[in-house]
């Protein structure tokens, strides 16, 4: 004979849980990006939420950028987040790469004015194939441009510049004098830690 399922305790646990609205930081207009459920508000802190930039700023031409936010504060039924990284989708990146051209990837750690360490990945696409010395020179120029921009910006401004494409435009200007460049894209960023002073 089949046993009866015990659903009472499971149902009680579910009823004890509460829904929280999740908001992005002020830098992105404190938009609501979704809901999360938890029995204890303290369990919410540290959770990672993802959303596309298109959803955050209501501009769906930017849906290829995936944003990551970490919940750092819960007040009432609202959960507030901080930016911890972004990534460009692989499909978008693949569509940019052309034949008979070089793709130059640079991963560089930068420290903002308020001492936050961010690891940034930049992809630089050339018009024609570059040799090894040109690739090295381009990577150096990218690293210098990133470090200089980060040193004069606080974390919030730095993140805005990265996600909006302003920093990529500055890097493009710095690099195009070295070798003919078709495009520069900051494809990934990740908040590592608060940098040591």
Swiss-Prot record:
One of its GO terms (cellular component) is ribonucleoprotein complex. The keyword Ribonucleoprotein applies. GO terms for molecular function: structural constituent of ribosome. GO terms for biological process: translation. The keyword Ribosomal protein applies. Keywords: Ribonucleoprotein, Ribosomal protein. Signal peptide: none annotated. Disulfide bonds: none annotated. Pfam families: Ribosomal_S3Ae. Coiled coil: none annotated. InterPro entries: Ribosomal_eS1, Ribosomal_eS1_arc. Belongs to the eukaryotic ribosomal protein eS1 family. This is Small ribosomal subunit protein eS1. It comes from Methanoculleus marisnigri (strain ATCC 35101 / DSM 1498 / JR1).
């Amino acid at each position: 004979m089949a046993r009866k399922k015990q659903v009472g305790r499971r149902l009680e646990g579910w009823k004890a849980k509460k829904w929280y609205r999740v908001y992005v930081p002020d830098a992105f207009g404190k938009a609501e990006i979704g809901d999360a459920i938890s029995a204890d508000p303290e369990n919410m802190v540290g959770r990672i939420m993802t959303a596309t930039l298109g959803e955050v700023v209501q501009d769906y031409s930017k849906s290829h950028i995936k944003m990551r936010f970490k919940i750092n504060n819960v007040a009432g039924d609202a959960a507030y987040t901080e930016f911890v990284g972004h990534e460009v989708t692989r499909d978008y990146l693949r569509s940019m790469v052309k034949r008979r051209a070089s793709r130059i990837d640079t991963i560089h750690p930068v420290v903002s004015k308020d001492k936050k360490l961010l690891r940034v990945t930049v992809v630089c696409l050339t018009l024609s194939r570059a040799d090894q010395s040109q690739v090295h020179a381009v990577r150096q120029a990218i690293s210098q441009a990133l470090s200089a921009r980060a040193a004069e910006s606080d974390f919030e401004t730095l993140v805005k510049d990265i996600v909006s494409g302003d920093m990529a435009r500055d890097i493009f200007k710095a690099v195009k004098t070295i070798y003919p460049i078709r495009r520069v894209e900051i494809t990934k960023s990740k908040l590592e830690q608060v940098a040591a002073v």
